[in-house]
Amino acid sequence: MSTKTARVQAYFAVAQMNYGEDISLAQVVAVHRGAFSAQITQGSDVKGDVVVAVTLATPGNCTDHPLWPPVVGDWVALADATQNHGEAAAHAVEIMPRTSYIERPAASGFGLSQAIAANVDELVIVEPLQPAFSIGRVERFVAIAHASAIRARVVLTKADLVADQEIQGAIEQCAPLVDSVTALNTTDTQAVAGLKESFTPGDTLVLVGRSGAGKSTLTNALLGTSLATGKVRAADGKGRHTTTSRQLLQGEVNIIDTPGIRALGATPDAEAVDQTFTQIAALAEQCRYRDCSHSGEPGCAVGQALTQGDLSPEVLERYQRMRRESERNELNRDARLARQSQRAASRDNTRGRRETMRLKGRGN
C-alpha cells in the first residue's frame, strides 16, 4: 500500500469516526464561484466518474473551519451524497489536513494571495523559450515551491522555435534552481513520453506559467485529454487564458491545470527566497554583519564575490528585488491578518453580549 493510499484511508476512518458510517470522502476537482465539484472515492454509491456538486453556502458546511474554503486537491468529508438523473450533490462537513498548500502572491504588493491547490507533490513550471524566456519568473515560482515545501521542476516549451544555444543557456540557468529541467516541443510525442516517464506514478502535479506557455497542450499530451488550447499572437508571443479555472485531471499522474499568470508577486516567505538563491544565501553566512543587506557594507562576502566575478550582478539584483518585495508582502499580510482577527473578535464579542442580554430578557 502506498503512503498516499494509506493517508486517504486514514482520512476516511477519521471522517467516519467523527460523522458516522454514512459519511463519504471526496477530492475537490474544480472550484467555482459559490460551489465546488468533488469526486467521491470512498463511502458512497455515488463514486467513480461521477462528479458531485457541492454548494459552499449549504447549511452544515464547515465555514468556520481554519482551512475553509476548499481548494482544488483538497480531501473533504461529504454528507448526504445523492444522485438523481445523473446529477449528484452533497454538502461538505470537513476539510481533511493538507500535506501541502500552494498560493500565488498577488503582484499588487498588499500581501494578498490567491489559492492555487492543495495536496500537491510537485510544481511544474512551464516556461516558453519563445518569445522571451524569463529566469526571473522561474525564480519566483521556485520560491513558491520552497514556501510550500514541495518539489519543483521546469519544462521549457517551444524548443523547436529557438536555437540549440538558447536552449542550453536556459537549461543552465534553471538547473541550479530545481530538481529537473526538460526542454521540448509539446507536440513531440516521443519527448512528452520521456517526460511522462520521469514523473512518479500517483503523484499530483500542478502546472503553472504565463498565458500561452503551453500548459493545456502539455496536459493534453500527458493525459490524452482534450482541454481547450489557444493561439498565441505572433507579435508578442502572448496567449489567451484558455484555462479559466483550476481543475484536477486524473490519470497515471494527477495534473492540476491552472490559468496563465501575467504578473507574479514575491512569496511573503523570505526564507523561501533565500532557499531559491542558494549561492547568495551561502555567501551571506560569511558576511561580517548578520543583517547585511549586501549593498556595500564592509565585510560583505556577497559584495566580494560580485567584485571578483564569482556572482552575477543580475542575479544579485533579482534576489534583492524579490527579498525586498517578500519582506514587504510579509508585513502587509501580517497586518491584514491582524485586522481580520480583530474584526472576528469584535463580532464574537457582539454576539456574546447579545446572547447575554437575550438570556436576561433584555434583548429583542
Model-derived features: where do they sit?
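Switch/coupling subdomain of P-loop NTPase systems
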Residues: 89-91, 111, 118-120, 133-150
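Canonical P-loop GTPase G-domain recognition
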Residues: 161-213
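Short aromatic-glycine-enriched beta-strand elements
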Residues: 34-38
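Conserved Switch II/interswitch segment of TRAFAC-class P-loop GTPases
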Residues: 87, 96-103, 120-137, 160-163
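Walker A/P-loop
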Residues: 216
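Helix-rich effector regions associated with P-loop NTPase G domains
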Residues: 3, 17-22, 41-43, 47, ...
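Conserved beta-strand/loop subsegment of P-loop NTPase cores
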Residues: 120-126, 149-159, 179-183
